[in-house]
Amino acid sequence: MKTTVDKLSDTRVKLTVNVPFAELDKEIDQAYAAIAQQVSIPGFRKGKAPRQLIDARFGRGPILEQVVNDMLPSRYEQAVTENDLKVIGQPEIDIAKLEDNDFVEFTAEVDIRPEFEVPDFSKISVKVPALETSEEDVDKALEDLASRFGELKDTKRKMKTGDYAIIDITTEVDGTKLDEASHEGMTYRIGDDNLIKGLDTALRGMKTDEDNEFTTTIQSGEHEGDEATVKVHVQQSKERKLPDLDDEFAQMASEFDTIDELREDTKTRVEESKKSEQAAAIRDEVLKAALEEVSFELPSSIVDEQVHAQLHQVMGQLAHDEKALAQLLEAQGTTREEFDADARKSAEESVRTQLFLDALAEIEEPEVSQQELTDHILFTAQSYGMDPNQFIQQLQSSNQLGNLFSDVRRGKALATAICRAEVTDEAGNKVDVDQYFGEIDEDEAEASEEK
């Protein structure tokens, strides 16, 4: 077999592969055997008809077609391996020439990973938020917990941020009512600022059964930019009453008997949460700094596939209804052109990161254990709200299991490289990166399990 490689761009090549018939004996034997099993020729048992009769009865065409189909995958892989090509995506294959009993020549255009030099992570320096837990942080966490047990009660005082109002709203442009911006009996939390611009300001200071009127500018939709008159009537005003943070609350909201025990546990949880946030910040900042050190062309077809996948996911959530997508974009104040541009930008960032991490993984050569892969599969299934067994079956049927393996490999490679970077917090203190990304040796792991 002879192969030539033509570089079409930094990210795409064309292989021309010439395979002599002398190397196709196995495929030819298999093709005749397969067709002999499918046909009945008088005087011969099924599968025993000689080649000459098969050629005479059906011609050489079906044999050659079968031979080509059988040999293409293995010969393509052989050509890729022999030329040390780092291909990504599926190839576009064409049969260029076929001379019976002589040779088969095919071409394959395929994207390849661009070449670039991975930066030295030991020369990367980043800053991340300091790991500090204040009493205010603990107070806020306890208040958030208490809010889950809060009750809405009527209030006669003037409303303020955080209160709830049951309201009627009428929005008009040039005297014409806008149904999409008019509501009756709607419950609204003052401070959310997610309905009509100026509504929060208008509601502050109002009481039950009062009316108010204000002008605003429509932010999206058909009347975007138009001045509108908004009339609001408060049916009811309510405030959220939170339980007292005492021992009784601790017993109701947790497994603890006293508020002091609950507070101490809450502090521990806040500290762990801040550690997770710091670890995520380290990962993001180091990766961002590393990516800024390299420049390479992206394979357009891979980016296109990513854009298509993102659109397919969004449309799947909307039952593939283009009208529903248009309504969603209108509600968000976004055009289809802006949506497509954002999708392409996101796809480019994703592909760029994956290609970089693949190159890093080749250098770091991390090993992925079966347990690590299983843990990642379980975590991913959980994030999708799927049964793990069904998720695995779906991965196997769509040949996507290798993608999750690559995800784990990329993550381990990045974790190893991050440990070489210099990380300080905003207070100027050096951060112990190993506590987040360092490997635990087997002795430590066993000791931890025994405890």
UniProtKB/Swiss-Prot annotation:
Quote the subcellular location field of this record.
Cytoplasm
Q: Which domain of life is it from?
A: Bacteria
Q: Which UniProt keyword terms apply here?
A: Cell cycle, Cell division, Chaperone, Cytoplasm, Isomerase, Rotamase
Can you list the GO cellular component terms from the UniProt entry?
A: cytoplasm
The chain positions of domain PPIase FKBP-type read 162-243
InterPro entries in the record = PPIase_dom_sf, PPIase_FKBP_dom, Trig_fac, Trigger_fac_C, Trigger_fac_C_sf, Trigger_fac_ribosome-bd_bac, Trigger_fac_ribosome-bd_sf, Trigger_fact/SurA_dom_sf
Q: Name one Pfam family in it.
A: Trigger_N
What Gene3D superfamilies does the record point to? 3.10.50.40, Trigger factor ribosome-binding domain (3.30.70.1050), Trigger factor, C-terminal domain (1.10.3120.10)
Per the record, the major location class is: cytoplasm
Molecular function terms from GO? peptidyl-prolyl cis-trans isomerase activity; protein folding chaperone; ribosome binding
Q: List the EC numbers from the record.
A: 5.2.1.8
One of its GO biological process terms is: cell division
Family, according to the entry, reads as follows: Belongs to the FKBP-type PPIase family. Tig subfamily.
Spell out the PANTHER family in the cross-references.
Answer: TRIGGER FACTOR CHAPERONE AND PEPTIDYL-PROLYL CIS/TRANS ISOMERASE, TRIGGER FACTOR-LIKE PROTEIN TIG, CHLOROPLASTIC
What is stated about domains? Answer: Consists of 3 domains; the N-terminus binds the ribosome, the middle domain has PPIase activity, while the C-terminus has intrinsic chaperone activity on its own.
Q: What does this protein do?
A: Involved in protein export. Acts as a chaperone by maintaining the newly synthesized protein in an open conformation. Functions as a peptidyl-prolyl cis-trans isomerase.
Q: What is this protein called?
A: Trigger factor
Please report the organism this UniProt entry assigns to the protein.
Answer: Corynebacterium aurimucosum (strain ATCC 700975 / DSM 44827 / CIP 107346 / CN-1)
The organism's taxonomic lineage, starting at the top: Bacteria, Bacillati, Actinomycetota, Actinomycetes, Mycobacteriales
